[in-house]
């Protein structure tokens, strides 16, 4: 009987990818804060393209001293292109083993601008050990639904007329980011106070979603 391998996703290895750089930056900080439970670790950001020796020196070197550290690798070179030769392929496999052996005091975060091609061997292998999260801009047609859910999570209910108003206004924008919608949601909740229902009048009174902003 064949035994199927089970993926072991590491709690201290994350991949953030997508075309919303603002959200990637915010999520990166949130992940670091949550992983270390509010403690402030030493954070190292390694710019693209990087190399295995550089990555290894920070991941392994910091672990030896048992210092709480977060190593952020931006647009790692192996994500965008396949190994040049067998030597580089072996280096990649060795790098994956380093990730698997990280101590809990070290958090590894990869950030990728744009789409992550999950068909490549490098992406598949990395995703087999690291948790991933897409951080992309929203289509205008999604905006009203997203902010309505945010408001619902805050205990608010969007009235039908207000929902139609949001769909009309947000639908005219070119691009939308989740952080911007979250900011708008926070403002609406503040203006609503103890009121559960969110009306069109309240949105207009708060000067929220009143005019189309520049693309975000």
Named regions from a protein language model:
Residues 210-216:
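Conserved small/polar residues in nucleotide/adenosyl-binding loops
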Residues 7-14, 21-209:
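Non-catalytic interfacial helical region
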Residues 2-5:
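Pre-Walker A adenine-sensing motif
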């Amino acid at each position: 009987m064949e035994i199927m391998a089970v993926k072991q996703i590491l709690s201290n290895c994350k991949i953030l990818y997508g075309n919303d750089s603002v959200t990637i930056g915010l999520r990166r900080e949130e992940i670091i804060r949550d992983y270390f439970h509010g403690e402030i670790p030493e954070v190292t950001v390694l710019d693209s393209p990087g190399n295995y020796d550089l990555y290894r020196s920070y991941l392994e070197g910091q672990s030896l001293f048992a210092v709480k550290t977060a190593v952020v690798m931006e647009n790692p070179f192996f994500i965008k292109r396949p190994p040049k030769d067998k030597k580089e392929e072996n280096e990649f496999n060795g790098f994956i083993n380093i990730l698997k052996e990280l101590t809990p005091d070290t958090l590894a975060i990869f950030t990728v601008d744009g789409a992550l091609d999950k068909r490549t061997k490098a992406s598949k292998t990395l995703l087999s050990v690291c948790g991933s999260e897409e951080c992309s801009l929203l289509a205008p047609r999604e905006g009203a639904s997203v902010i309505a859910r945010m408001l619902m999570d805050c205990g608010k209910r969007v009235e039908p007329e207000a929902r139609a108003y949001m769909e009309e206004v947000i639908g005219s924008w070119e691009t939308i980011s989740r952080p911007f919608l979250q900011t708008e949601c926070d403002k609406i909740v503040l203006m609503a106070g103890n009121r559960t229902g969110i009306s069109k009048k309240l949105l207009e009174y708060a000067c929220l979603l009143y005019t189309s902003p520049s693309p975000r």
